[in-house]
């Protein structure tokens, strides 16, 4: 009895086009050969005019940029096919380090004085004050266990879901992503309480009670919820 040949390429039709599931154990050259053979059939000629989107899933195979381009070129050379995405379940060590830096909470204990700038890639937990003229910047959220009287910029790389929270919120300016808010009027003595700032549905920065934060941003991590 002839042994059934291992299928390295599986093609599935979807409402958005077709999805290619590529085996992650065979050699890359074998993969390209079988992909070329299977896409050379007449199944995807369509009406000769409409482009068909192709989503490529490669599982636990890491593809270099050159290999990705080889796959794109092979598919592009077939009639009416265009690559929409190539998805892999693995990342490089460098990508993993960058992701960790962007998502981790960085605890720092200090006073940010006038003229000083404190910048972290991920989420900032500052135990101390931000004095007038001082600036704190984070790629993610900013939590100040102390007085925020300077400038705070959260979501620096474009994260509009980022938040700013402080034990005492009297900033010179707040920025989240590309949205800015000038300081509200100075609070009366004794009226200060922990507050948070976020972008609302109208794309405006709103300052509200800190207790609302876990309801407004339920996707905060367990550690971040513990902070607020």
Swiss-Prot record:
Entry function: Cell division inhibitor that blocks the formation of polar Z ring septums. Rapidly oscillates between the poles of the cell to destabilize FtsZ filaments that have formed before they mature into polar Z rings. Prevents FtsZ polymerization.
Stated name of the protein: Probable septum site-determining protein MinC
Record carries keyword Cell division: yes
The entry's keywords: Cell cycle, Cell division, Septation
Record gene name: minC
Lineage of origin: Bacteria, Bacillati, Bacillota, Bacilli, Bacillales
A single GO BP: division septum assembly
Subunit structure: Interacts with MinD and FtsZ.
Superkingdom field: Bacteria
Protein family: Belongs to the MinC family.
Species whose genome carries this gene: Bacillus anthracis
């Amino acid at each position: 009895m002839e042994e059934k040949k291992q299928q390295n390429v599986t093609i599935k039709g979807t409402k958005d086009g077709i999805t290619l599931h590529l085996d992650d154990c065979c050699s890359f050259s074998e993969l390209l050969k079988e992909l070329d053979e299977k896409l050379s059939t007449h199944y995807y000629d369509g009406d000769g005019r409409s482009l068909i989107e192709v989503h490529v899933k490669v599982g636990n195979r890491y593809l270099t940029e050159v290999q990705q381009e080889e796959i794109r070129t092979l598919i592009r050379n077939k009639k009416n096919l265009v690559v929409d995405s190539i998805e892999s379940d693995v990342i490089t060590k460098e990508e993993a380090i960058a992701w960790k830096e962007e998502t981790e909470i960085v605890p720092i204990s200090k006073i940010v004085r006038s003229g000083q700038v404190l910048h972290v890639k991920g989420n900032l937990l500052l135990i101390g004050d931000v004095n007038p003229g001082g600036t704190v910047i984070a790629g993610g959220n900013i939590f100040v266990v102390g007085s925020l009287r300077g400038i705070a910029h959260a979501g620096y790389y474009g994260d509009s879901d980022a938040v700013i929270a402080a034990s005492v919120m009297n900033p010179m300016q707040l920025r989240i992503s590309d949205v800015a808010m000038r300081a509200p009027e100075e609070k009366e003595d004794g009226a200060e309480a922990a507050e948070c700032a976020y972008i609302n549905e109208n794309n405006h920065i709103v300052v509200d009670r800190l207790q609302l934060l876990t309801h407004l941003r339920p996707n905060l991590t367990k550690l971040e919820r513990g902070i607020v």
